[in-house]
């Protein structure tokens, strides 16, 4: 079992229960899922770029990504409905906790010119979204084999009712918010 999951059960639940005066342990917010999304718009011209993006995301997450397709045709971008334009992975359970631990302890500190993550990236319902400009911050990616530096979106979905609870949950895991 992941260390952060044990830490959540043993420490964070009690901390948040007293802080927000919850009647039941089940009211305490928890991380539901983590979604990784990589948009590969250049895949229209070169299909190999999408395959490389899928391989990168599979290495980062530990599971096979789903290839996302365009929902509608947009003439300005020269895409048609059904064209593959990206890939995504939804992590839950054990893999989610392991990824979250690697994200906080290894990947985020390796971001170039890192001064902390913005606390304004909450969506109003306690979910946190962040963008990563380079996939090479993850140790699973071999820097020499990277064909192109790609970014990805990371969304942490929680059961928190509002941003304050969501921020308290992530801060309890020492999430590196900007001061």
Swiss-Prot record:
Alphabetized UniProt keyword annotations: Ribonucleoprotein, Ribosomal protein, RNA-binding, rRNA-binding, tRNA-binding
An MF annotation (GO) of this entry: rRNA binding
A single GO BP: translation
InterPro entries in the record: Ribosomal_uL5, Ribosomal_uL5_bac-type, Ribosomal_uL5_C, Ribosomal_uL5_CS, Ribosomal_uL5_dom_sf, Ribosomal_uL5_N
Superkingdom as given in the UniProt entry: Bacteria
Gene3D superfamilies documented for this protein: 3.30.1440.10
Gene Ontology CC entries for this record: ribonucleoprotein complex; ribosome
A Pfam family recorded for this sequence: Ribosomal_L5
Function field: This is one of the proteins that bind and probably mediate the attachment of the 5S RNA into the large ribosomal subunit, where it forms part of the central protuberance. In the 70S ribosome it contacts protein S13 of the 30S subunit (bridge B1b), connecting the 2 subunits; this bridge is implicated in subunit movement. Contacts the P site tRNA; the 5S rRNA and some of its associated proteins might help stabilize positioning of ribosome-bound tRNAs.
Subunit relationships: Part of the 50S ribosomal subunit; part of the 5S rRNA/L5/L18/L25 subcomplex. Contacts the 5S rRNA and the P site tRNA. Forms a bridge to the 30S subunit in the 70S ribosome.
Homology family: Belongs to the universal ribosomal protein uL5 family.
Protein name: Large ribosomal subunit protein uL5
Annotated organism of origin: Actinobacillus succinogenes (strain ATCC 55618 / DSM 22257 / CCUG 43843 / 130Z)
């Amino acid at each position: 079992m992941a260390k952060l999951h044990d830490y959540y059960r043993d420490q964070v639940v009690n901390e948040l229960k007293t802080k927000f005066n919850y009647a039941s342990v089940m009211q305490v917010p928890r991380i539901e899922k983590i979604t990784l999304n990589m948009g590969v718009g250049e895949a229209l011209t070169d299909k190999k770029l999408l395959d490389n993006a899928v391989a990168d995301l599979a290495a980062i997450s530990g599971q096979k990504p789903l290839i996302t397709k365009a929902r509608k045709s947009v003439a300005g971008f020269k895409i048609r409905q059904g064209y593959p334009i990206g890939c995504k992975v939804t992590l839950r359970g054990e893999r989610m906790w392991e990824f979250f631990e690697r994200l906080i302890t290894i990947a985020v500190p390796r971001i170039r010119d890192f001064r902390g993550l913005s606390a304004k990236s909450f969506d109003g319902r306690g979910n946190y979204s962040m963008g990563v400009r380079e996939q090479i911050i993850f140790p699973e990616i071999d820097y020499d084999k990277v064909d192109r530096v790609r970014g990805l979106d990371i969304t942490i979905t929680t059961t928190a009712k509002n941003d304050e609870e969501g921020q308290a949950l992530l801060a309890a895991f020492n999430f590196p918010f900007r001061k």
